[in-house]
Amino acid sequence: MAVNPFKPTAGKMPPILIGRHSIIEDFSEALTNGVGAPGRIMLVTGQRGFGKTVMLTEFRRIAKAQHWEVIGETASAGLVTRLIAALSPSGLRLDQANISPSIGISGIATASLGQAYFSAESNPLTLRNALNKRLGSKKLGKGKGILITIDETQAASHDDLVAIATAVQHVITDADESDTPDEDKKGVAIVFAGLPYMVNDLLDNEVTTFLRRALRRELDNVPLPDVKNAFLETVADSGKTISGEDALEAARQSEGYPYMVQLVGYYMWQSAQRRGSDVITADDVSTGVSDALLAFDDAVC
């Protein structure tokens, strides 16, 4: 049974990433070019439905393919505590964490700006030395590192962002102070993603310097020729066909808005499928656009 190839679900990888080649190259090249490459600290912004979460998923896929370790997080209370736990030896237990300028972890630890001092069984552990410990692992090859992605950055607390910025800057400095050749140094890459106007608000505090030094990329509408070609390729790969003219009309109706591209594609494909046809016609495109608009209104209103 044929399966609809279009995926208009939040955060779901589409069959083809369109119009994002430049940002993907920025990131991939940064991993290759070593510690200090601009793309190793990146801020990705865009309106809802523009594919920020999908971009982070793709970055993690790229990093894994290059034998990096990856940690994917979404900003919410306890972000720094979760990062420390993810970087720490298995079995390390964090209970009742409260991330603020002064952190208390009842019965286990106290912390400040991302520092967490654990009880007798472990050495004092901070986000900085948790990163350094993990980077020192023999499991990581020369020139590799740890990628951290943080989605919905606009929801991050001020103190979490200060803790992360401070830790990452120190880890970069620590690497500089080692005698290891640059091409062999293990490093950290971090990518933040969030809404433009809310992220702008975050730039007006103590993390301004760190985030402003980040390579900033804003996701925008996808060019219509790219959308048309994606429709042609995706439909063909699914076992159906669509004319160039109808694919262009579907692209125009989507206006290059990534979420709408997936909606239009999904419903026009489904229209043909319901007819038992392997050909997506102009009528299927029209039906698909109408259904997509209804679904879009339900999703955003």
Model-assigned labels for residue ranges:
Residues 38-58:
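Walker A/P-loop nucleotide-binding motif
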Residues 252, 256, 260-301:
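Winged-helix-like regulatory helical subdomains adjacent to P-loop NTPase cores
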Residues 219-246, 264:
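Conserved small helical "lid"/interfacial subdomain of P-loop NTPases
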Residues 65, 70, 80-113:
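Conserved NTP-binding/hydrolysis module of P-loop NTPases
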Residues 43, 57-79, 146:
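Conserved catalytic segments around the Walker B and adjacent sensor/switch elements
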Residues 1-42, 86-89, 173-184:
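A short, basic N-terminal segment
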